[in-house]
Amino acid sequence: MTAVETVLGSITPNLLGRTLTHEHVALDFEHFYRPPPADFESELKAKISMSTLGYVRLYPYSSKENVRFYDEEALEAAKKDVLLYKKHGGGSIVENSSYGLKRNLEFIVELAKSTGVHFIAGTGHYIHAVQDASHASLTVEQMSDLYTKDILTGIEIKGKMVKCGFIGEVASVYPIHEFEKNSIKATGEIQEVLGCGVSFHPHRDAQAPFDIMRLYLEAGGRAQKCVMSHLDRTLFKIEQLVELSELGCYLQYDLFGTECSYYQLNTNVDMISDGQRIENLMKLIEEGLLDRLLMSHDIHTKHRLTSYGGHGYHHIHTNILPRMFARGVTLEQVEQMTVTNPANWLSFDP
């Protein structure tokens, strides 16, 4: 019998409810810090406040406080927003912090207990540049053993074993580094054996998702259990998205709430708006891809939490879905993207 593995134990897929498939509640994102523009250096070095928030929104990766998404203030703010998510109808959150991002599994467990929201934790490796020496030298076989242990046996937290429920986010640069090729291969091998869900973070290059899928499929992974994340900053043409869908993976729009067109991590492109995300999802529905679509926010900096003037984890439910309904998207279509698709992706029988 298939089930979903949450940090508090197995549940039947129908208990997930509305699910955010790509979020973070605690992680270290300091590797992606960018020096601030000289004209705004003092504002971006100052503590985040109403007088500096405008600068942080424009240059989110140039505030060291903003990318330190792991201190006590961040954890308190994240908990507040998870409770708001629950209040506004949220059921589950898939926490995508993997090895290299300093995942706080103890905090995730505490959140699940205190808020009533189901949390699914991931295993797997982020990009090679953020790995410590003990992980950077792992072979494919050692990675496979690690992922299997995290899913089948679990990780000890305060005397209890906490199991991961999927492999992700598995991240890579472009061209894909050898370490990352190994992690993708290990992911494919273990997915074939366990049947679990997988989530990939492609680099900001249009070819990256296709190269990842090739490596994953060659290793034996099932496309139907694979999510390609961050497509709203990677593939900008509907034709590209349709081509990727032909490989069988889920297409995930997971930067809802990011409304600043200037994208510091790839200044050669303009970040699309929530309105464009909605428009693209509607076009993909017209292409017959409703059962392959997922939505989330990928919150990973403080300024996107409500305590710092942000939108929180409830943004899709309170702001985006009403706009989609107003444009003709049906309740059944929304339920497919936010309830059924996540449940189908996450459920497996190890």
From Swiss-Prot:
Note accompanying the cofactor annotation: Binds 2 divalent metal cations per subunit.
What residues does a divalent metal cation 2 bind to? E169, H201, H230
Q: Does the keyword Metal-binding apply?
A: yes
The protein's required cofactor(s) are namely: a divalent metal cation
Q: Identify the residues that bind a divalent metal cation 1.
A: H22, H24, E169, D298
From the Swiss-Prot or TrEMBL record, what is one GO molecular function term? zinc ion binding
The GO biological-process annotations, alphabetized, read as: catabolic process
Entry EC no(s) = 3.1.-.-
Instruction: Tell me the Pfam families matching this sequence.
Output: PTE
- Identify the keywords attached in UniProt to this record, alphabetized: Hydrolase, Metal-binding
| InterPro entries referenced in this protein's UniProt entry, alphabetically | AryldialkylPase_Zn-BS, Metal_Hydrolase, Phosphotriesterase
Judged by the first EC level, this protein's enzyme class is hydrolase
Establish whether keyword Metal-binding is in the entry: yes
Q: Which family does it belong to?
A: Belongs to the metallo-dependent hydrolases superfamily. Phosphotriesterase family.
What this protein is called in its record is Phosphotriesterase-related protein
